[in-house]
């Protein structure tokens, strides 16, 4: 009988990438096939996020729901990975003693032997070490699920922003060798992938060894990826303003495959708060980078992350954040109320802003950025957009959907599955709050 794997992923795109590689790994080494139903699974894995307190609470709530499955099937293996696993380690079993395997982002390649050991010894297996970049040497060739794929180019972060747990849960920055990244992308394009998203906690900090002993920076990596056969679009995330260099800006102007969309987190528009966060740049320096980028690529859209209610944030600080939003005109944001994370420097700061004030500020910020995003979408009405068709529409099986280079989901009436994985031109007829609708112009050239 075929053994089944159920995997649930919380958090960032790095976690999504890691989960996909776990599927590849366990498919090759243990012949596990993915199921969408945890009650069918022989192995259940939870890939976790610890960026906010609610995300961490969600982990133990989910584990609690799986406890009955373990009681009904003692041979079921339950594993917890990701940043909560890295942060909590064996302590996870204090609250969920039925967990069999605890592994960190850098040790997921050891899953097959950890699962085997848990089964044979009937004892929990815990490995949350940081063996640098070893995991990539132990992972099989990636499988493909559609025309787009994530590729991790580096791990960890060395910025140590005062609010962030990433350096403690994923380690410091370690870059994959240039040739390794290019090999993985070539393996993907050979299987039909046309768009890659390069991933890292701070991709701008990429410093990968080259075959001739040099160190390639991120701009060089972008040019090298663009030179590969079959690559028609390149995205990347996440970036840090401090290392968003002139060379990267030039790459945006020079590389046609680079999309006209950039996620460049700023977190706050207040220099005082930015200093308290240890972001090591000012709001003016951030705006200067954006101005230079827009001079090179006038129609590029910018998104960001924002933290509202950081300890000590005053009304003036928030007004400065809103001023930055007005000046830049962000298209989208991941924005949240500050969540204190144990072990970070900011956890020791006095948080004296009332919760209601934080909620009000967040609502104001999100409303304004949503306005900018919708304005950008409405400007696309009447234009022709080149989209990469990814799948059928989730809400209407009579429609296909894809994404523009400016990161807009477009739905259009068509039931021809041959278009999935292809680039097509779509006339944009209408802008909705979270997507566009259009009309397919000509699919006669699609084979």
Swiss-Prot record:
Domain Radical SAM core: 143-375
Location in or out of the cell: Cytoplasm
Keyword Cytoplasm: yes
Chain ranges passing through the membrane: none
Amino-acid positions noted as binding [4Fe-4S] cluster 1 in the UniProt annotation, renumbered to this chain: 12, 49, 83
CC cofactor note: Binds 2 [4Fe-4S] clusters. One cluster is coordinated with 3 cysteines and an exchangeable S-adenosyl-L-methionine.
Residues that hold [4Fe-4S] cluster 2 according to the record: 157, 161, 164
Catalytic activity: N(6)-dimethylallyladenosine(37) in tRNA + (sulfur carrier)-SH + AH2 + 2 S-adenosyl-L-methionine = 2-methylsulfanyl-N(6)-dimethylallyladenosine(37) in tRNA + (sulfur carrier)-H + 5'-deoxyadenosine + L-methionine + A + S-adenosyl-L-homocysteine + 2 H(+)
Any one of the GO CC terms: cytosol
GO molecular function, a single term: 4 iron, 4 sulfur cluster binding
Domain spans labelled MTTase N-terminal: 3-120
E.C. numbers: 2.8.4.3
Required co-factors: [4Fe-4S] cluster
TRAM domain boundaries: 378-442
Top enzyme category: transferase
Gene3D superfamilies cross-referenced by the UniProt entry: Methylthiotransferase, N-terminal domain (3.40.50.12160), tm_1862 like domain (3.80.30.20)
UniProt KW keywords: 4Fe-4S, Cytoplasm, Iron, Iron-sulfur, Metal-binding, S-adenosyl-L-methionine, Transferase, tRNA processing
Biological function: Catalyzes the methylthiolation of N6-(dimethylallyl)adenosine (i(6)A), leading to the formation of 2-methylthio-N6-(dimethylallyl)adenosine (ms(2)i(6)A) at position 37 in tRNAs that read codons beginning with uridine.
Assembly and interaction partners: Monomer.
The family this protein is said to belong to: Belongs to the methylthiotransferase family. MiaB subfamily.
Protein name: tRNA-2-methylthio-N(6)-dimethylallyladenosine synthase
Organism phylogeny: Bacteria, Pseudomonadati, Pseudomonadota, Gammaproteobacteria, Pseudomonadales
């Amino acid at each position: 009988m075929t053994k089944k794997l159920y995997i649930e992923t919380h958090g960032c795109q790095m976690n999504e990438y890691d989960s996909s590689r776990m599927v590849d790994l366990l498919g090759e080494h243990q012949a596990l096939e993915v199921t969408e139903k945890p009650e069918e699974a022989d192995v259940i894995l939870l890939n976790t996020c610890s960026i906010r307190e609610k995300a961490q609470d969600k982990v133990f709530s989910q584990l609690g729901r799986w406890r009955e499955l373990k009681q009904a099937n003692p041979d079921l293996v339950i594993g917890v990975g990701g940043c909560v696993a890295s942060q909590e380690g064996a302590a996870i079993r204090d609250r969920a003693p039925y967990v069999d395997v605890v592994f960190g982002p850098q040790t997921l390649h050891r899953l097959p032997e950890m699962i085997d050991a848990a089964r044979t010894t009937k004892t929990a297996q815990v490995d949350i070490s940081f063996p640098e970049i070893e995991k990539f040497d132990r992972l099989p060739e990636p499988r493909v699920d559609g025309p787009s794929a994530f590729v991790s180019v580096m791990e960890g972060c060395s910025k140590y922003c005062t609010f962030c747990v990433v350096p403690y849960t994923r380690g410091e920055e370690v870059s994959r060798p240039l040739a390794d990244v290019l090999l993985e992308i070539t393996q993907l394009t050979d299987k039909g992938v046309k768009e890659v998203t390069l991933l890292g906690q701070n991709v701008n900090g990429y410093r990968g060894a080259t075959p001739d002993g040099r160190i390639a920076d991120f701009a060089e990596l972008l040019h090298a990826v663009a030179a590969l056969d079959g690559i028609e679009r390149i995205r990347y995330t996440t970036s840090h303003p401090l290392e968003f260099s002139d060379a990267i800006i030039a790459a945006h102007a020079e590389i046609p495959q680079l999309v006209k969309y950039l996620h460049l987190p700023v977190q706050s528009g207040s220099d005082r708060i930015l200093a308290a966060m240890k972001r090591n740049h000012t709001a003016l320096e951030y705006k200067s980078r954006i101005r230079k980028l827009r001079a090179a690529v006038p129609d590029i859209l910018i998104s960001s992350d924002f933290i509202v209610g950081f300890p000590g944030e005053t009304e003036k600080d928030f007004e400065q954040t809103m001023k930055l939003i007005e000046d830049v005109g962000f298209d989208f944001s991941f924005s949240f109320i500050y969540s204190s994370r144990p072990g970070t420097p900011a956890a020791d700061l006095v948080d004296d802003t009332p919760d209601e004030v934080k909620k009000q500020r967040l609502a104001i910020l999100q409303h304004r950025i949503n306005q900018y995003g919708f304005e950008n979408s409405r400007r696309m009405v009447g234009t022709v957009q080149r989209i990469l068709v990814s799948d059928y529409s989730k809400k209407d099986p009579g429609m296909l959907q894809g994404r523009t280079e400016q990161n807009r989901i477009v739905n259009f009436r068509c039931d021809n599955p041959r278009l999935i994985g292809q680039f097509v031109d779509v006339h944009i007829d209408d802008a909705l709050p979270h997507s566009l609708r259009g009309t397919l112009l000509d699919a006669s050239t699609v084979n």
